[in-house]
From Swiss-Prot:
Subunit structure: Collagen polypeptide chains are complexed within the cuticle by disulfide bonds and other types of covalent cross-links.
Name the UniProt record assigns to this protein: Cuticle collagen lon-3
Species of origin: Caenorhabditis elegans
Cystine bridges: none
Composition bias type Basic and acidic residues, residue spans: 296-311
Protein family (similarity comment): Belongs to the cuticular collagen family.
Transmembrane segments: none
Gene: lon-3
Compositional bias (Low complexity): 136-151, 168-181, 210-223, 235-246, 261-273
UniProt GO MF annotations: structural constituent of collagen and cuticulin-based cuticle
Length: 324
């Protein structure tokens, strides 16, 4: 396997791994976004549902006198599945609606056959306002007239009200504060796969890549046709140019061979006498010199006469081999 093939394989594998990682990251992000959106929708729907239930509970008026009458009319808390008779609306001319348990009835002005109900404000109480300035003390009021003694109410069973139970909806109240987050809902079914996207616009041409490795040698081509003979014009010799500048000194070359011995030169003048040199070594013993003259007579010896012993001194020297 060549280096080029191994490099190409590694690059292709790295690119494929990068594309798969990007696709997986995009898929995970899309799923998380869809789940988050679904949870937000479920939470919003749950808030709306709880708000509706709370509004219905407020409209029912739990703990009020009318609720007690309705419970008693339908059999109380221990009622069975049977329904109480529907309330009967008054027919014909409008008159006072008697309230059970009271000997007198309220004065109701005449009108149409529609239900005469007062609109109750079921909105929650708003925040307390700022404390105002203290006002001046008022004048003492006039003593009231003593009232009449009340009449004892007979002990009668509560009767259902003859009026309508549902009143027209009032004006919407101010928006309440945001409630606590609800319980996380169940995960929904997996959505349908989306449509494939369209191809994007072609990108700008990239930069030129590095020079590739030289390719294999191609097959030798066929021999071409023989060309025409060329003409070689011979030009005239031009004028000699100016001498160029002297170049830099070259490196020192190797030592040359010894030259031939030249002829002896002219004898020079006699030089100045030099300094006296040191004593040389002793030379070899020279030849024996001639015999010396006879010495003087010694004091301890009587000299012979010249006539008697002329050769006595020479004989003595030969005997003792004295060397001078």
């Amino acid at each position: 396997m060549s280096v080029t093939t191994a490099t190409s394989g590694a690059l292709i594998f790295s690119g494929a791994s990068l594309l798969v990682s990007l696709f997986a990251a995009a898929s995970i992000y899309s799923q998380v976004s869809s789940i988050w959106t679904e949870l937000d929708n479920e939470i919003d729907s749950f808030k709306l549902l709880t708000n509706d239930i709370w509004g219905d509970m407020i409209n029912l008026g739990a703990g009020s006198a009318s609720n007690r009458i309705r419970r008693q009319a339908y059999g109380g808390y221990g009622a069975t599945g049977t329904n109480a008779p529907e309330p009967q609306f008054p027919q014909g001319d409008k008159g006072p609606l008697p309230v059970p348990g009271l000997p007198f009835g309220p004065n109701v002005s005449g009108g149409s056959d529609r239900c005469q109900c007062t609109v109750e404000n079921t909105c929650p109480t708003g925040p307390d306002g700022e404390e105002g300035e203290q006002g001046p003390d008022g004048q003492d009021g006039v003593d009231g007239v003593p009232g009449f003694d009340g009449q004892d109410c007979p002990d009668v069973e509560q009767q259902p009200s003859q009026g309508c139970f549902t009143c027209p909806q009032g004006l919407p109240g101010p928006q309440g504060s945001q409630g606590a987050p609800g319980i996380r809902g169940m995960r929904g079914a997996r959505g349908q796969p989306g449509y494939p996207g369209r191809d994007g616009q072609p990108g700008m041409p990239g930069e030129m890549g590095p020079t590739g490795a030289p390719g294999d040698d191609g097959a030798p081509g066929a021999s071409g046709m023989k060309g025409d003979d060329a003409e070689k014009p011979v030009g005239r010799q031009g004028q000699r140019g100016q001498p160029g500048e002297q170049g830099p000194d070259g490196e020192e070359g190797p030592a040359g061979k010894d030259a031939f011995e030249g002829p002896p030169g002219v004898e020079g003048e006699v030089g100045v006498p030099g300094y006296q040199g040191s004593a040389g070594p002793d030379g070899e013993e020279g030849p024996r010199g001639p015999s010396g003259l006879p010495g003087k007579d010694a004091e301890y010896c009587k000299c012979p006469t010249r006539d008697d012993g002329g050769n006595s001194h020479r004989a003595w020297r030969r005997k003792h081999k004295r060397v001078y």
